[in-house]
């Protein structure tokens, strides 16, 4: 039996003239496109041919007189695949009554999209989660290093999120909108419903859902900023990825935050800092003296690094596995500690953090920034 009361996570909104105009604009554009520019939409509405150059915003509407359907209005707001499922499950209502896509709609009608309860799809295991953001549709946490996002064979972040949902009465599946490698830290975004997943995935596909990273790479990156566009695919060994003409195109933009020319040998002796100009900008240089005759110094661990390192801010436009790691390795600047892609061993995880995400709130239209 369908429920009659609203829950906090349901979607409620009242149809406005703007919603009607959005449908008319869409119809107007489609008609012009399908008729090689001949404006049959305007003429079918009784608008004289002398006014056929008017914009769709000039078209008048009078609520029901426009003959606008619920399906047409929702189609301007939500992915069609999600709408089909919501209508099949009878979760969409007009003025409190179950609705179909063909139902007529007018200004001031109330639309109610009920969010169905779901069974949690991962074993709930308590974890110390660092929650960065939460609303009715999204849940964003700061993933620590050394934890996988989702794994059937071992404890993963999905188990911790499932426990949080259960503990807070959130009867939802765990839907990850992004993934991070085990050693990558920072923003992990989880959708609380299929509709939210579809809407925010659409933003990711359109690159209006921004994903920003901080990385430390080997060597002095000369360009202040650049866009790395390479085709990538999984290598023959099945372990890592590589730039390959047969792969899918990826885009990784970056800007250099700072550059360091460093000689790091042993932190225990005669360390001092200085500032030098290496031709790009003034950077910190760290010099270390060491007793080369000391048998306790591991010369393989404390290898002299003439190249230094750079800290970069990265924006990811595509979401290929290991994309940032592959891109910087390909240009000769692997992430510090990323031995899989050619970096010197440091004994520490590679330096990559999902620093922030920026997106448009699916209910309010507000731009939201979440920083880890």
Regions found by a protein language model. Name each.
Residues 1-372:
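RNA pseudouridine synthases
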